[in-house]
Regions:
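Glycine-rich, charge-decorated loop segments at or immediately adjacent to ligand/cofactor-binding or catalytic sites
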Residues: 88-96, 175-186
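Substrate-binding cleft of extracellular glycoside hydrolase catalytic domains
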Residues: 4-161
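Aromatic-lined carbohydrate-recognition surfaces of secreted/lumenal glycan-active proteins
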Residues: 159-179
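Acidic, His- and aromatic-enriched active-site or binding-groove loops in soluble protein domains
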Residues: 106, 149, 183-193
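Hydrophobic anchor at the start of a short beta-strand
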Residues: 77, 164-166, 185
Length: 193
């Protein structure tokens, strides 16, 4: 669950009760200039989901350098992988998924000793690839299907490696589009009221 700072939690968050965990996403583009674990703890942050990899590259040196302070404060850390599904095609998506998960697993081994505090996560996106691939391929039925197949392959690989299904970390739009039967026990909101 994400806790919206300084506001009364929305009704759907309150429904989880006092046992709910509240967390943040920290990636290279949304990191504060300095991580202050005591400020996070004071604001009831229980966990932080950290982007360790994106596509075929490692991506978050900033947070990795500060993981020790966060862990010693009692904040749980969970790695996530931001996939580059838009680089996959029908004939190579399994190979591409394997390569991405090999890099992600290597980073989990390196920074978590292979045992993260929480289950590794996959950031499920629309297939938008930034400046080089500005048009989401998910706008077509074929693109949507490939996007889902790619992410399912990522999930299969992670389950084989870690013995648990990964968390799927995504925006509300994807939950409605792709995960209508998903467990509502996890809720993430970004930039919404």
């Amino acid at each position: 669950l994400w806790k919206t700072s300084g506001k009364e939690p929305p009704a759907q968050v309150q429904a989880f009760g006092s046992n709910a965990l509240f967390g943040l996403d920290i990636s290279g583009w949304n990191s504060p200039k300095k991580i202050k674990a005591d400020v996070f703890k004071k604001n009831s942050v229980d966990f932080i989901v950290i982007k360790l990899t994106q596509g075929m590259s490692t991506s978050n040196k900033f947070i990795v350098d500060q993981m020790k302070e966060l862990r010693s404060s009692g904040i749980l850390l969970a790695p996530y992988h931001f996939s580059s599904a838009q680089h996959s095609r029908e004939n190579n998506f399994k190979r591409r998924a394997q390569k991405e998960m090999d890099i992600f697993s290597r980073e989990i081994d390196k920074h978590f000793g292979g045992k993260p505090d929480l289950t590794p996560s996959i950031d499920f996106e629309s297939g938008h690839g930034g400046r080089r691939h500005p048009k989401p391929y998910g706008l077509t039925v074929r693109g949507h299907n490939l996007n889902v197949r790619f992410h399912l392959e990522l999930a299969r690989i992670l389950k084989r490696r870690y013995g648990k299904r990964p968390l799927v970390y995504t925006a509300n739009w994807a939950r409605g589009s792709y995960f209508s039967k998903a467990d509502p026990g996890l809720l993430a909101e970004f930039g919404s009221e």
